[in-house]
Amino acid sequence: MANASSEPKGGGKLLSFVGLGFWQTWWMVAMCTDVLLPNPASTPFHLSLSALLLIASCLGYAVVVLLGRLDLKGRIGFGGVQALTGVLSVAGSVGMGVVAHTGLLTVGGGALFVIAVAAFSLGNALLLVSWGTLWSTLATGYVGRLLCVSYTAAFVLFFFVRALPLSAAIAASALLPLASLVGYSFAQRAPRRAPVHQHATWDAVPVAKALVALFVANAVWGVSQKVLTGTSASVDLAFAFGGLCLLAFTAYLFVAAPTDEPTALYRPILPALACGFALVFVLPPEDLFLGEGIMIFGGYCLDMFIMLVSSDVAFRARKPVVLVFGTALFVARAGSLLGTLAGEALANMQASTVGVAFACIACLVVAGTLLFSSSELDRMYRVHVEPSADSLYEEKCAAIAAACGLTARELEVLGLLARGRSAPFIADELCIALGTAKNHVSSIYRKVGVRDRQSLHNMIERESLR
């Protein structure tokens, strides 16, 4: 386990904070611009370029999961995985950009472009799964906030790359995954948590419901990207407004410092997507970007929620993170693919946008209530109580602290939490800032493997049974 002295400092710490942002920018540039994609009018393919990318992305995550089962990291080492990721990512980005904008696009019926897309997608999947594996082990209680910072930074980088000339934008796109790898290397020095004291029972995790809800929500997102499209100017405004919404949400997370980050990321997803759909039909044409921007915000909250919860639950259940995290991303991309194909078909049929929006909102309501509500999220983190007559709280807290690698200060906070003390009381008692107290509580929850105070109390009650 890393110690405080090995943590990244200065520029390295900044890179570790926003390292994922370079990956997200890379994906946004590929999906939302023509930097790496050819003109749709000159493409030799019989399906849309976004659908082609999503198909390759699904296959990329499937291959990464398979490589994880074959112990790729054990065979070629940590450095080998990083080198392979970098080579595939750069080769894929440069290959896509060069082939897309030259006569090479028609060679072999587009075979060169397909090869470049395959390299891009596999490198993209390897990089994101590497980040997910790292997040699952971090001891800090604000992984969700770091995700929000990275995604917010990605909007700034996205507009920067879009403003570059084509050749420079292609070069920048190839450098983005390398920058993310550098940030990932620095983030490796951050403190890690030990295996959780009371791991989750995998049978208690509503896997099927979660995956179906994930598929449905991403399918709705895919439909929205094809049915509710505007002009280039409105798309720019939509991304700008979506970025501002995410910036405000990130600021809220840092000010409020919620100890339950999974729930904090879950709450805005359905309201943002549903309200975005509704606003598109209420607002005048010149203001449509507001609804589209809110949907972008909701879609990216969904992405971050998937990444945070799937990596954390895999670690707590002691399942291979590559398998759980990679499968969740595969299902998400498959949902986006189906939604994209359905959206294109509906657009070609000139289907009623009001009817499409109504159906999408209904699907979101079903996904967020019947399939995977906040109560299902609670089940993934709940520790079932087994009351004990033993009341030796100090000994129990000390045992939990030793097993989970809590610091001396966190042990003090744990002792107060065990007695039902609130964060403001703990701050006053220990003469520390309220935000510091909340960060200690959040870190304790993450290291111990719970997400609320009741589960922590239940775990302390169970301690004498060991």
Please identify what each model-predicted range represents.
Residues 108-129, 287-303:
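Hydrophobic core of transmembrane alpha-helices in multi-pass small-molecule transporters
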Residues 3-4, 26, 30-36, 40, ...:
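Linker/hinge segments immediately adjacent to helix-turn-helix/homeobox DNA-binding domains
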Residues 387-439, 447, 457-466:
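Helix-turn-helix DNA-binding segment
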Residues 50-71, 246-252:
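Central cavity-lining transmembrane alpha-helices of secondary-active solute carriers
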Residues 124-148:
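Cytoplasmic helix-loop-helix junction between adjacent transmembrane helices
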Residues 2-28:
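Cytosolic juxtamembrane N-terminal segment immediately preceding the first transmembrane helix
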Residues 86-105, 271-284:
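C-terminal ends and interior cores of transmembrane alpha-helices
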